[in-house]
Amino acid sequence: MARYLGSKCRLCRREATKLFLKGEKCYSDKCAMERRNYVPGQHGQRRRKVSDYGVHLREKQKVKRSYGLLEAQFRTLYKKAERMKGVTGENLLQLLERRLDNVVYRLGLAASRTEARQIISHKTLLVNGKMVNVPSYLCKPGDVVAVREKSRGQLRIKGALASAMQRGLPSWVEVDAEKLVGTFRSIPERSDLPAEFNENLIVELYSK
């Protein structure tokens, strides 16, 4: 499957906001957004007039890149959100939050969603006692995510969890730091999700 192999820091600068793609670096002074808070490229510091389509596209790209999805994956989730009852934009964000790679990241078992996908693919985790190695697996309220016993000594998992516990975990997840076991308690409400996302622009973009 295709993957973006370029600089993740350039993506943050392109979207003019922190996407938290580099783990701990994003919380430090080494973050590119702290040092070069402008669009990358030769003419990055020039002011540009953005078209209406450009505004909608940038919002979609920002959300898609935050969760580390490819266009096909993102569009598939959007179509699923359209078929669900309720508000399409909110449904989309909730589906993104339910992805196993995101839940692992929210639980603090990985420093970033990219690292979470790697941990999942390496068969490090159990979901409700069963091994799951599919990052796109959609978690349900009450699902229990645990690090397999033979992997509990991994320093990167312990380090990521320690940092996440210091910053504070979202209200819709809980974790036992000693046992490295977390629970996806509930689907987050819109008010719990990032305020900088304007999902209505994404709906308008795909509706055109």
Swiss-Prot record:
This is Small ribosomal subunit protein uS4. Part of the 30S ribosomal subunit. Contacts protein S5. The interaction surface between S4 and S5 is involved in control of translational fidelity. One of its GO terms (biological process) is ribosomal small subunit biogenesis. CDD domains: S4. It comes from Magnetococcus marinus (strain ATCC BAA-1437 / JCM 17883 / MC-1). The keyword RNA-binding applies. InterPro entries: Ribosomal_uS4 (IPR022801), Ribosomal_uS4_bac-type (IPR005709), Ribosomal_uS4_CS (IPR018079), Ribosomal_uS4_N (IPR001912), S4_RNA-bd (IPR002942), S4_RNA-bd_sf (IPR036986). The keyword Manganese does not apply. The gene is rpsD. Keywords: Ribonucleoprotein, Ribosomal protein, RNA-binding, rRNA-binding.
